[in-house]
C-alpha cells in the first residue's frame, strides 16, 4: 500500500505542477508585443525557447531573492527590496486595477548572467519586463502610479507616510522615467536609483521593435512559474523538486545564442536596426575578449553602428554625455584600464568606419574620444601616465588591459565647434 500524502505534501506537489503548467502556458502562448522578430520565428520555429537547467534555476532564484538597496535622495531612507517582492506587489496591484499582466521576464545582462555567469560580463541593471496592454494613456499612467505607490510598502517601519505623495516618491527614488508611444513602439520604463549602478528597471511593454543588439543580450527568462512556486509551496526547491522555468532568445535560436555567450562570439541579425548605443556595446565586447562571428562582414557591421550612433547622438554634447554615462555604468571605480581600452577601441572603429560625417565633425568626435581616453589613462597612476601610450589593438580589435602602452598621434582638441554645414561666402 502506498503511504498517504500529508496536506502539505499535496499542496507542494500541486504547486510544482501548477508552476510547470504556468511556464508551459506562457511559453506556448502567442507572443505578446515585444517578442521575437517574426522573421526569427520563421527561421527557427520552436527553437527560440528552452528550459533552464537546475543550476540556472538556482542562480535565478538567488538573484530574485537578493535584497537590493534603493537609495533615496535628500533625507529619504534607503529601501531594501527583493526583486521578487516588487514584482509580486506591482503585478498583483496592476491585476486588481484591471490591467492584465501577460508575463513577467528577466531581460538583458542579468538574464545572460543567470544562463552563463562565466562570460566575464557580469550585470549591472536588473531589467524586469512586464508584458501588458498599453492601448491608452490611462494604462501608461496606471503603471507609473502603481510602481510609485508600491514604494510606500517598502519604507522602513516608523516612517510617516501621511504626507508622502507620488510626486515626492518620484523625486526621491526614481532615477529615470521613460515613455515611448509610436506606431511600432509602446512601452514605458521606471528605473529605481542605486548608487552603485545596479538599478532596478521596471519596463512595461506592449510592443517594441527591437529589444536586443547582439545574440548574447537577447535572452529573456520567464519568471511566472518560479514566482508562483514561491507563493504556493512551503518546501524548498531541490534538483528533484522545482518548477519548470523557460528561457527565450529574441535573436531566434536559443541554443545558438547560448553558444555565442559561452564562446564569446559577437553575432546579430539586421544590424541596420541596432540603436546608437550598440556601437558602445560592440567596443565593450571586443575589450572583454569577444570576437565577431567568422561569417560576419565586420566593416559593414561597424559602418551601420557608427551611422546609427551619429543619427541618435548628432551633436558633441550628446556624444560626451552618452559616452560618460556608458563608461560610468560599465567601467566605474578601479576599472580605468579597461575603460581606457574601450575608448581606444572606439577611437579605432569610429576612425575606420564612419562614412556619414563631414571631416571636421568626425575629427571633433575623435578628439572627444581621445580626451576621455587620456583622462582614463591618467587615472591608472603615475606609471601609466608616464608611459602616455596604449598598446595598439590587434587584428581582432582587442586591446589588452595593461600599462604597456603605445602612443598614436591624435589631432589637438578643437577650440571651437562648427555647424554641420559651413557658411558659403
Swiss-Prot record:
Q: Which domain of life is it from?
A: Eukaryota
Record protein name field: Terminal nucleotidyltransferase 5B
Main site of residence? cytoplasm
Reported EC number(s) for this entry are 2.7.7.19
Question: What family classification does the UniProt entry report for this protein?
Answer: Belongs to the TENT family.
Q: State any GO BP term from the record.
A: negative regulation of cell population proliferation
What role does this protein play?
Answer: Catalyzes the transfer of one adenosine molecule from an ATP to an mRNA poly(A) tail bearing a 3'-OH terminal group in an ATP hydrolysis-dependent manner. May be involved in maintaining the translation efficiency of at least some genes through preventing degradation of their mRNAs. Prefers RNA molecules that are adenosine-rich close to 3'-end. In addition, may inhibit cell proliferation and cell cycle progression through ubiquitination of beta-catenin/CTNNB1.
Effect on the protein upon substituting residue 275 to A: Loss of polyadenylation activity
Question: What's the effect of swapping residue 210 to A?
Answer: Loss of polyadenylation activity
The region called Disordered is annotated at 1-42
Subcellular location per UniProt equals: Cytoplasm; Nucleus
Q: According to the UniProt record, what happens if one changes residue 330 to A? A: Loss of polyadenylation activity
Q: Which reaction does it catalyse?
A: RNA(n) + ATP = RNA(n)-3'-adenine ribonucleotide + diphosphate
Amino acid at each position: 500500500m502506498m503511504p498517504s500524502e500529508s496536506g502539505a505534501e499535496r499542496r507542494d506537489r500541486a504547486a510544482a505542477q501548477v508552476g510547470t503548467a504556468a511556464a508551459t502556458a506562457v511559453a506556448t502562448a502567442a507572443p505578446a508585443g515585444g517578442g521575437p522578430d517574426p522573421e526569427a520565428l520563421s527561421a527557427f520555429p520552436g527553437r527560440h525557447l528552452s528550459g533552464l537547467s537546475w543550476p540556472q534555476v538556482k542562480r535565478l532564484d538567488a538573484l530574485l531573492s537578493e535584497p537590493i538597496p534603493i537609495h533615496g535622495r535628500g533625507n529619504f531612507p534607503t529601501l531594501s527590496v527583493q526583486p521578487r517582492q516588487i514584482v509580486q506587489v506591482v503585478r498583483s496591484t496592476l491585476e486588481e486595477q484591471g490591467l492584465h499582466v501577460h508575463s513577467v521576464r528577466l531581460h538583458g545582462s542579468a538574464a545572460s548572467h543567470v544562463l552563463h555567469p562565466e562570460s566575464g560580463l557580469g550585470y549591472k541593471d536588473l531589467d524586469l519586463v512586464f508584458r501588458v496592454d498599453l492601448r491608452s494613456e490611462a494604462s501608461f499612467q496606471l503603471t507609473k502610479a502603481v510602481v510609485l505607490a508600491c514604494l510606500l510598502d517598502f519604507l522602513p517601519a516608523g516612517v510617516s507616510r501621511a504626507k508622502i505623495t507620488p510626486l515626492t516618491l518620484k523625486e526621491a527614488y526614481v532615477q529615470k522615467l521613460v515613455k515611448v508611444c509610436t506606431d511600432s513602439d509602446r512601452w514605458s520604463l521606471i528605473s529605481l536609483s542605486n548608487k552603485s549602478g545596479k538599478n532596478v528597471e521596471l519596463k512595461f511593454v506592449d510592443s517594441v521593435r527591437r529589444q536586443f543588439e547582439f545574440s548574447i543580450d537577447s535572452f529573456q527568462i520567464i519568471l511566472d512559474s518560479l514566482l508562483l512556486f514561491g507563493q504556493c509551496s512551503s518546501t524548498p526547491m531541490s534538483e528533484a523538486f522545482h518548477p519548470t522555468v523557460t528561457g527565450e532568445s529574441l535573436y531566434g535560436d536559443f541554443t545558438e545564442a547560448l553558444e555565442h555567450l559561452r564562446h564569446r562570439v559577437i553575432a546579430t541579425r539586421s544590424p541596420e536596426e541596432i540603436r546608437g548605443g550598440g556601437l558602445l556595446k560592440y567596443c565593450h565586447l571586443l575589450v572583454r575578449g569577444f570576437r565577431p562571428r567568422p561569417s560576419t562582414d565586420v566593416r559593414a557591421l561597424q559602418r551601420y553602428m557608427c551611422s546609427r550612433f551619429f543619427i541618435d547622438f548628432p551633436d558633441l554634447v550628446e556624444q560626451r554625455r552618452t559616452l560618460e554615462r556608458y563608461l560610468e555604468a560599465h567601467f566605474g571605480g578601479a576599472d580605468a584600464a579597461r575603460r581606457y581600452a574601450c575608448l581606444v577601441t572606439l577611437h579605432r572603429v569610429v576612425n575606420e568606419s564612419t562614412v556619414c560625417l563631414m571631416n571636421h565633425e568626425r575629427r571633433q568626435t575623435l578628439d572627444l574620444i581621445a580626451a576621455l581616453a587620456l583622462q582614463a589613462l591618467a587615472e591608472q597612476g603615475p606609471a601609466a601616465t608616464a608611459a602616455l601610450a596604449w598598446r595598439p589593438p590587434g587584428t581582432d580589435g582587442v586591446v589588452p588591459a595593461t600599462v604597456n602602452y603605445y602612443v598614436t598621434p591624435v589631432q589637438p582638441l578643437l577650440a571651437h565647434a562648427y555647424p554641420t554645414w559651413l557658411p558659403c561666402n
